[in-house]
């Protein structure tokens, strides 16, 4: 019936068009002056206009549905791809790398005081559900603590120490000593200070060992009758990475150069590349009297490796910056200080948002952390991007022209850090992805590691192989630290 009516309307239109051609304008106008005919023409034209609009709306809705479907499908593919990467990285046969990623945590964090597996939330948000593993208890008589301070903070201090161990049970054996760092509260009578050391000890037990994470050796706790809690960790010889970059800036060797054909292009768009000598087996010099682009790439890759390990636990760092990355004399790094200071409202470089709430290192914090206090792997990724700015600028302060109190407003207005002087353009493109305001669009740390592996495999294969070989040796060395708590 509807089709028949539509057919009749079309006939009317064709008829009137034909009449317009056959008769003169005056004749046609006189014909259409008939009110009945004029009304029918208007109705037909109006209905046809409505029909065309209806068709256009249907087409628009179909296009929107297709776009939404393709978007969801793409998101699912990206999630599946991310899962595949994670599985590949955790499978030594597939990954064909060293076994440094397969070291088991020293505490089974999925079964400690938990009805629900602790992996459902970051362990530093579930610290009250963890218990100290008694296997890490150290006899204080075997520990010598020097008066030499390695560092100090609002609640605690770190001192150099020596831990003693005999190689066997015979009377003639010599006593071995291991250099360690000992963390203790400033005032053992302050309950909150002691609680902070206790919580950090439990957290480090749960994290386990990774060559790019500062490893726990043991602890002296109140369970052994001690008057104060002592946390014993690896001694990292060269202090924090930020200070190292600042001190070595004058001898830095820039290995990032313009391509030979760059003169054909305007300087602003000339392409940069690395100038590595791939004929050398060791791209990185272990001497601490040298610093070059290869070192910066190595440090950046190692931080991503360590953060990927933390994210797999999961553990959110919450305070990632180069001041919290330590450097060994063989140029391997250790990520330290897992943000527990924020829980206890330590000031200093932190600021309080609008005068209340928990303290924050504003220059490194993601916007959602400043607004909502929500810390996730993706907020750590934002901080990692800021740390890379520090890295490739050789220690420049992020947003150096902005005061602490104005950093938040500066960031939320869409201002990003500029490309550092010694940064490859492809690296900077990646860094800008870390600073996406929508955290879901920031890459995971697995993706960060994958980026560096692809980046280095193309530009510096020997450098990548050297880093991975060194990290394997560090993992083996860390595994031997258990001897110092298992032998009497």
From Swiss-Prot:
InterPro entries named among the record's database cross-references: Kinase-like_dom_sf (IPR011009), Prot_kinase_dom (IPR000719), Protein_kinase_ATP_BS (IPR017441), RTK (IPR050122), Ser-Thr/Tyr_kinase_cat_dom (IPR001245), Tyr_kinase_AS (IPR008266), Tyr_kinase_cat_dom (IPR020635)
Keyword Cell membrane among UniProt keywords: yes
Chief location bin: membrane
GO molecular function terms noted in the UniProt entry: ATP binding; transmembrane receptor protein tyrosine kinase activity
Catalysed transformations (reactions): L-tyrosyl-[protein] + ATP = O-phospho-L-tyrosyl-[protein] + ADP + H(+)
CDD domains noted in UniProt: PTKc
GO biological process, one term: cell surface receptor protein tyrosine kinase signaling pathway
Membrane topology qualifier: Single-pass membrane protein
Keyword annotations of the record: ATP-binding, Cell membrane, Glycoprotein, Kinase, Membrane, Nucleotide-binding, Receptor, Signal, Transferase, Transmembrane, Transmembrane helix, Tyrosine-protein kinase
Transmembrane segments: 51-70
Pfam families: PK_Tyr_Ser-Thr
Tissues where this protein is expressed: Hypodermal cells.
Sugar-modified residues: 25
Keyword Kinase in annotation: yes
Residue ranges of domain Protein kinase in the record: 144-458
E.C. code: 2.7.10.1
Topological domains, Extracellular: 27-50
Cytoplasmic side: 71-488
Compartments (UniProt record): Cell membrane
Binding site for ATP: 150-158, 183
Active-site residue numbers: 319 (proton acceptor)
Signal sequence region: 1-26
Role: May be specifically involved in cell-cell interactions regulating cell fusions that generate the hypodermis during postembryonic development. It has a role in the development of the HYP7 hypodermal syncytium.
Family, per entry: Belongs to the protein kinase superfamily. Tyr protein kinase family.
Protein name: Receptor-like tyrosine-protein kinase kin-15
Lineage start: Eukaryota, Metazoa, Ecdysozoa, Nematoda, Chromadorea
């Amino acid at each position: 019936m509807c089709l028949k009516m539509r057919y009749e309307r079309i006939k009317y239109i064709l008829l009137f068009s034909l009449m317009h051609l056959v008769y003169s304008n005056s004749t046609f106008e006189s014909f259409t002056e008939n009110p009945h005919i004029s009304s029918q023409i208007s109705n037909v034209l109006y209905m046809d206009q409505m029909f065309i609009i209806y068709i256009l709306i249907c087409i628009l809705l179909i296009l929107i549905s297709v776009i939404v479907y393709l978007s969801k499908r793409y998101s699912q593919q990206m999630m599946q791809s991310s899962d595949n990467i994670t599985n590949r990285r955790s499978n030594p046969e597939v990954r064909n790398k060293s076994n440094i990623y397969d070291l088991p945590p020293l505490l089974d964090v999925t079964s400690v005081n938990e009805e629900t597996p602790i992996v459902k939330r970051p362990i530093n948000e579930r610290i009250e559900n963890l218990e100290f593993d008694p296997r890490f208890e150290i006899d204080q008589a075997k520990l010598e603590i020097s008066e030499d301070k390695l560092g100090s903070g609002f609640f605690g201090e770190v001192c150099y120490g020596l831990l003693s161990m005999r190689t066997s049970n015979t009377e003639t054996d010599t006593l071995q000593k291991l250099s360690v760092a000992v963390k203790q509260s400033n005032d053992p009578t302050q309950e909150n200070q002691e609680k902070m050391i206790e919580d950090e000890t439990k957290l480090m037990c749960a994290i386990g060992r990774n060559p790019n994470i500062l490893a726990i050796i043991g602890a002296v706790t109140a369970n052994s009758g001690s008057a104060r809690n002592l946390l014993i960790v690896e001694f990292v010889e060269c202090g924090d990475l930020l200070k190292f970059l600042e001190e070595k800036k004058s001898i830095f060797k820039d290995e990032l150069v313009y391509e030979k054909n760059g003169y054909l292009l305007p300087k602003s768009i000339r392409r940069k590349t690395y100038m590595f000598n791939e004929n050398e087996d060791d791209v990185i010099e272990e001497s601490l009297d040298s610093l070059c682009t290869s070192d910066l790439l190595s440090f950046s890759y190692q931080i991503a490796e360590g953060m990927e390990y933390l994210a797999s636990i999961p553990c959110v760092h919450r305070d990632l910056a180069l001041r919290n990355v330590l450097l060994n004399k063989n140029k391997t790094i250790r990520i330290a200080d897992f943000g527990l200071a924020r829980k206890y409202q330590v000031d200093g470089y932190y600021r309080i948002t609008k005068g209340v709430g928990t303290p924050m290192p504003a220059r490194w914090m993601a916007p959602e952390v400043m607004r909502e206090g929500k810390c996730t792997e993706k907020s750590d990724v934002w901080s990692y991007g800021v740390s890379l700015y520090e890295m490739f600028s050789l220690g420049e302060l992020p947003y150096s022209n902005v005061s602490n109190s104005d950093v938040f407003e500066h960031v939320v207005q869409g201002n990003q850090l500029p490309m550092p002087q010694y940064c490859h353009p492809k690296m900077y493109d990646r860094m800008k992805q870390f600073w996406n305001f929508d955290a879901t669009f920031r890459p995971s740390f697995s993706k960060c590691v994958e980026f560096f592996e692809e980046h280095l495999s193309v530009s510096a294969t020997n450098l990548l192989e050297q880093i991975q070989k060194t990290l394997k040796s560090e993992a083996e060395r860390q595994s031997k630290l258990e001897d110092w708590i298992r032998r009497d």
